[in-house]
Amino acid sequence: MSLRKIIHIDCDCFYAAIEMRDDPRLAGRPMAVGGQPGQRGVIATCNYEARAYGVRSAMASGHALKLCPDLEIVKPRFEAYREASRDIHTIFRDYTDLIEPLSLDEAYLDVTDSQWFAGSATRIAEDIRRRVAQQLHITVSAGVAPNKFLAKIASDWRKPNGLFVITPDQVEEFVAQLPVARLHGVGKVTADKLARLGIDTCHALRDWPRLALVREFGSFGERLWGLARGIDERAVQNDSRRQSVSVENTYDHDLPDLNSCLEKLPELLSSLNERIARMDSSYRPDKPFVKVKFHDFSQTTMEQAGAGRDLESYRQLLSQAFARGGKPVRLLGVGVRLRDLRGAHEQLELFGDI
């Protein structure tokens, strides 16, 4: 079994969190995102105050209001959720390019080869949580484990706003006490069949030989045998369609002022243009952007639709970005958003566990 470092990030009640962030009046009271009851609406997600009344995702809005008469239901704002998701993925890409999005609010990261924090996946997860809270003003839960199956379980272990780590030496004991219903791919039908066979935990499942499980469950029996032992060889499937291309550099000595930053632009743009030239023809460069990280680790990104990709356009963007902080700079980045000419579109998982 290969040893990898996998992080599963799951935003806490994502749609609701964005609404409460943008409208503080909603915070601290039961609220949900979804359709109105008079229109046969359905709850997309709700905050934890509403969950205390039994309100859940995919519940009819009318039923939710019966459970919680004071529930405030707001219309979804999908573009706001997409924008927040893009910002979160920008943070992810600082640590690894191996990112598998599951929905707007959930993703796997493979940080096995990351050099951040001397390769500590736990510290990377902590830093991601800190940066999301600081920059987006919402919380995420994180799970760290040697594989995807365990990382996803771990992220749910201390929700909301939690971090749980399963180290390789803890896998066998941790998995043994797991209910079989928590296993990846085990739905109600399979869970009921396992219960009829007297199998309620992974410890009990381990008593069954591999061939016996295959006889009972077909090819999924092989999967059950492995999961009961904490084995999951699925790789993080990187998102093959890029949203941007960029280059950045962290300087040994902080750049003290705007002019010293502007002097670095030609070299950065030369590297960026080399990367763009290597891309296939299914992408078209779109909006240019610059990224500035100041000496105190605060950062800002400036982009402009319709601007050119020439040196003067980037000089203007950098000048505007620098003005937001006006402090010595430790990192500069330049890039361009990409338009996917294949027409790929992002799917919203409205009724997922969000």
From Swiss-Prot:
It is an enzyme of class 2 (transferase). One of its GO terms (cellular component) is cytosol. The keyword Kinase does not apply. Its main location: cytoplasm. It comes from the Bacteria. The record marks Y15 as: Substrate discrimination. InterPro entries: DNA/RNA_pol_sf, DNA_pol_Y-fam_lit_finger_sf, DNA_pol_Y-fam_little_finger, DNA_polymerase-Y, DNApol_IV, IMS_HHH_1, Rev_trsase/Diguanyl_cyclase, UmuC. HAMAP family: DNApol_IV. Monomer. This is DNA polymerase IV.
